Structures are given as structure tokens and as C-alpha cells.
A protein has these predicted regions:
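Hydrophobic/aromatic-rich structural module bridging two neighboring secondary-structure elements via a short loop
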Residues: 31-37
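Phosphate-/nucleic-acid-contacting segments
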Residues: 115-158
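Residue-level recognition of specific faces of alpha-helices
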Residues: 16-19, 50, 63, 101, ...
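Alpha-helical bundle regulatory/interaction domains
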Residues: 79-95, 99-105, 110-114, 118, ...
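Regulatory nucleotide-sensing modules
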Residues: 1-18, 22
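Cyclic-nucleotide recognition modules
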Residues: 37-96
Length: 158
């Protein structure tokens, strides 16, 4: 994908699972037609999909866009299903992958409502330090649910 190109577009059914070999992909949704809210940024060696859309075959509620030129290995859902029925090890891998993604989403959801902005910031620094080295701070502040100004203050305090 080239910078700015979409892997998933809000309103379209996501039929692909991707693996990021290199680059950065931003998961975001638009609120009130103009306000982008970043939910995650994937770096290399991660899988990407709009899971709700991909699994349930419904229109995506989020966008996944390349923040940088990116190399993505893509597999169609029908091919994933075929491989699962043909290769038991692939099925086991796929189940573990989806379980891991669901746990990450659940943890993120709970952390967002139970932790303070400072606690979320510290946790993200520990769990994903590369984000702070590679991703523009505007996306990190959006992921944390705070303004760029608040993030700047947190960085000075911590």
C-alpha cells in the first residue's frame, strides 16, 4: 500500500486478512463527519483486519489506512477458510490469532474505562515502546483518548 491508501474502508465489507511486513497502518473511525479517532496503529510483523466486518461479513465501522508506504501480505477470507479445512495446523494457528486479537481488544476496552490517561500512557510505553519512536504523536494521543497538548504534558511529567 502506498501512504494514504486504504486496506479497509468504513462502510465496505472487509474480506481480507493482512500481515504487515513493513510500514504503519492506522485504525480509525470518523466521529461527527470530521473528527478522526485513532484506535490503533499497527507496525511491521502484525496482522491487520477489521475483525467485526471480516468475521461477520458486515460493513466495516472503521478505516485502516497506510500512514507510510507499507508492504502487506494479503489473504482472502475464502482462502483462509479453505486452508483451515485442509490443514489442521493452520486452523489451530488461526484460532490462536483470533483469540489473541479478541483478548487485546477486550483489554484495551477495559483499560480505556478503568485507567487514567497517565496510566494508559505508561502502560502503552511499556507494552509498545516502538509506537513512541515511530508513530506521530497526534495518533498516539488519539489512541489514548487525549489531546496532543495533554500528551505533551504527560510526557514532561513522566
Amino acid at each position: 500500500l502506498t501512504k494514504g491508501e486504504y486496506f479497509v474502508k468504513e462502510g465496505k465489507v472487509a474480506t481480507q486478512l493482512g500481515f504487515v511486513e513493513s510500514g504503519q497502518l492506522q485504525f480509525y473511525t470518523t466521529v461527527n463527519q470530521y473528527d478522526e479517532r485513532t484506535t490503533y496503529v499497527s507496525l511491521e510483523n502484525t496482522f491487520v483486519a477489521s475483525l467485526l466486518s471480516y468475521i461477520n461479513e458486515v460493513p466495516a465501522r472503521e478505516n485502516i489506512r497506510a500512514l507510510t508506504d507499507s508492504v502487506i501480505w494479503i489473504i482472502e477470507k475464502k482462502d483462509v477458510c479453505n486452508l483451515q479445512s485442509q490443514i489442521s495446523a493452520f486452523k489451530d494457528f488461526y484460532i490462536k490469532l483470533i483469540e489473541y486479537q479478541l483478548c487485546c481488544i477486550d483489554k484495551s476496552r477495559l483499560d480505556f474505562i478503568t485507567l487514567s490517561a497517565q496510566e494508559r500512557y505508561l502502560q502503552l510505553q511499556i507494552q509498545e515502546p516502538r509506537l513512541f519512536q515511530e508513530v506521530p504523536l497526534q495518533y498516539i494521543s488519539s489512541m489514548l483518548g487525549i489531546s496532543p497538548r495533554h500528551l505533551s504534558r504527560l510526557r514532561k511529567v513522566v
